[in-house]
Amino acid sequence: MPLSPDVLAAALKAATSYVVNAVEVLRFGGLQTDEETSPYEIVAHRPMFRLRRYFAQDAGEAPGTPVVLIPPMMISADVWDVSPATSAVAALHAADLDPWVVDFGSPDLEDGGLERTLTDHVVAVSEAVDLVVAATGRSVHLAGYSQGGMFCYQA
């Protein structure tokens, strides 16, 4: 199924709204929603990031175009999937897209995390894109929230 610009724009607009809502949730109390998050698998683990593939169980059903979502530094990758009502990854999946998320982890908990540079993040995004292309055989769309968008632009 070819991806039309209108479908992608609508899905990314919805995803942006969900991220804004998710940031508000974080601001007012965190991610404790007692709701199920979307299923994902960690398909790659690197010192700089983990690559999540959401709805991997559906991957054998000819998933749509891959969309790689990039969070900003210091914000949990869970911002893309706080709850079913505010889940960017669920909205993308419902639009027949194949959502992936780059998880940089918590710098204070990751080995060498506090020494990471902006360049390290940009290189990590580039590597994640290569991994998704290798896994799917398809070109990807990148979407980033705040500083994550800048990482996409620079990658």
Q: Over which residues does each language-model region extend?
A:
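Glycine-rich adenosine-cofactor-binding loop
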Residues: 103, 132, 144
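Short, surface-exposed "cap/lid" segments of acyl-processing enzymes
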Residues: 36-108
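Gly/Ala-rich beta-loop-alpha elbow adjacent to hydrolase catalytic centers
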Residues: 143-152
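N-terminal targeting or regulatory segments adjacent to alpha/beta-hydrolase or S9 domains
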Residues: 1-34
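Conserved acidic catalytic loop of the alpha/beta-hydrolase fold
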Residues: 107-112, 122-140, 153
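Generic signal for short, ordered secondary-structure residues
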Residues: 30-31, 70-71, 111
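Flexible, glycine/proline-enriched loop segments at strand-loop-helix junctions
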Residues: 115-116, 142
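Short, hinge-like loop/turn segments at secondary-structure boundaries
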Residues: 117-121
